[in-house]
């Protein structure tokens, strides 16, 4: 994951070294929570467990600073420069598509998938998330609980 696209909070819509990059430009540098969640899930599905966990934990940290509600988009400034996610001036909060992002992040962290009648649980948590639980998951398997815990040095 390059620092050009990863702000420390999520994935930018454009790399920071591109000529048109603008960290508060709607499609040219902002971070979109729903895009980042889809990217995290894709990384997880293709075996990039550590990178997916980094994206998920970073976005969940941003959500805490937005009072547990993710906006449509926020500025793509580097996390080390601002220490908090900078609001995009006209972003909707809440935004319908951003509300699903934390759920997909949790799915990526717990490695939840289905295989016919079975729920697959394959957690990969970053050290910043010690324990994660998702209870009473309905499906063809009936209802199940999923648990994950961080292990030092293992993702």
Model-inferred region functions:
Residues 30-67:
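Extended amphipathic alpha-helical segments enriched in small hydrophobics
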Residues 91-133:
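Catalytic cores of secreted or luminal carbohydrate-active enzymes
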Residues 1-31, 64-87, 103-110, 136-145, ...:
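Extended glycan-interaction surfaces of carbohydrate-active proteins
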Residues 29-45, 92-107, 154:
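Well-ordered alpha-helical segments within folded domains of soluble proteins
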Residues 7-9, 49-55, 66-72, 111-122:
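Acidic/polar loop patches that form or flank catalytic/metal-binding clefts of enzymes
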Residues 23, 36, 85, 89-90, ...:
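Generic preference for well-ordered secondary structure
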Residues 26, 36, 74, 81, ...:
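A generic alpha-helix propensity feature with a strong bias for hydrophobic helices
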Residues 43-54, 115-155:
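Beta-rich accessory regions
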């Amino acid at each position: 994951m390059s620092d050009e696209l990863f702000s420390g909070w999520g994935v930018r819509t454009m790399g920071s070294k591109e000529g048109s990059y603008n960290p508060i430009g709607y499609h040219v540098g902002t971070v979109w929570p729903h895009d980042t969640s889809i990217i995290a899930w894709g990384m997880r599905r293709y075996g990039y467990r550590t990178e997916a966990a980094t994206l998920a934990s970073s976005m969940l940290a941003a959500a805490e600073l937005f009072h547990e509600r993710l906006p449509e988009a926020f500025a793509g400034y580097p996390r080390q420069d601002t220490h908090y996610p900078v609001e995009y001036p006209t972003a909707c909060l809440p935004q319908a598509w951003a509300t699903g992002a934390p759920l997909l992040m949790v799915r990526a962290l717990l490695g939840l998938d289905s295989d016919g009648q079975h729920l697959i649980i394959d957690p990969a948590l970053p050290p910043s998330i010690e324990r994660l639980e998702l209870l009473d998951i309905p499906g063809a398997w009936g209802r199940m609980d999923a648990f994950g815990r961080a292990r030092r040095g293992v993702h």
